[in-house]
């Protein structure tokens, strides 16, 4: 396992442990994606989080906030000791991502399904501005039971948003149990292809 991924997971566990409650599984399962984006791919500047033309990550499964905070701290967006204030009075790190509180967060997480729609809108705006940014979004597999995900996927394909990359975190779990027992998703890759997306399946 990559050492940075290991550190993201360690800090995530410590972050959640500091408050004693949180979505630990859904946070740990996106460590590799976060590492690749923030350390290898995304054009961002921790010293200037609102930099024009930056790449953006919109975490639609906002309950994975602790992992996002861990990678942001590692990249220098804010001090690591902020991690131990998760969801406490006066914190800048609420349990779900909040763009008005946390440096480096580009969209506030709300009801499941909404974040990806926001990502589609941001990608459209980026095209209009011609700023050459890439917009990334992380979607939960349980979240994919929301119809709004598929409305957004359909629109993105219609608009030919080649500046938008979506990751579905297929960890097979949601708050009420296994995804396939709660509301089976079947072959998610086939569903995305049917909506006009180019799909790659990655282990890890």
Regions found by a protein language model. Give the residues of each.
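Residues at the starts of beta-strands that form the adenosine-phosphate
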Residues: 134, 162-165, 198
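A short, conserved beta-to-alpha structural element at the edge of catalytic cores
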Residues: 158-184
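Structural motif
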Residues: 20-28
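Conserved thiamine diphosphate
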Residues: 131-132, 180-204
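Gly-rich Lys/Arg/Thr-decorated short loops/hinges at beta-loop-alpha junctions or inter-strand turns
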Residues: 100-104, 171-173, 190-195
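Cofactor-binding active-site loop characterized by glycine-rich and histidine/acidic residues
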Residues: 12-15, 27-158
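N-terminal capping segment at the start of a domain
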Residues: 5-21, 169-171
């Amino acid at each position: 396992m990559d050492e940075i991924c290991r550190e993201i997971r360690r800090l995530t566990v410590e972050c959640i442990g500091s408050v004693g409650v949180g979505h630990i599984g859904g946070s740990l399962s996106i460590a590799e994606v976060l590492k690749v984006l923030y350390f290898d791919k995304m054009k961002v500047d921790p010293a200037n989080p609102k930099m024009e033309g930056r790449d953006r990550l919109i975490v639609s499964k906002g309950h994975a906030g602790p992992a996002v905070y861990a990678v942001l701290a590692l990249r220098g967006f804010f001090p690591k000791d902020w991690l131990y204030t998760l969801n406490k009075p006066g914190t800048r790190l609420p349990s779900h991502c909040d763009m008005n509180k946390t440096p480096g967060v580009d969209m506030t997480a709300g009801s499941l399904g909404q974040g990806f729609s926001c990502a589609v809108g941001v990608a459209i705006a980026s095209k209009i501005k011609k700023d050459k940014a890439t917009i990334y979004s992380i979607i939960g597999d349980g979240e994919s039971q929301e119809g709004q995900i598929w409305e957004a996927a359909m629109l993105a394909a219609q608009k030919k948003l080649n500046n938008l990359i979506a990751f579905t975190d297929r960890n097979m779990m949601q708050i009420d149990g296994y995804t396939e027992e709660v509301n089976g998703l079947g072959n998610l890759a086939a569903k995305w292809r049917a909506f006009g997306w180019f799909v790659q399946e990655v282990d890890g």
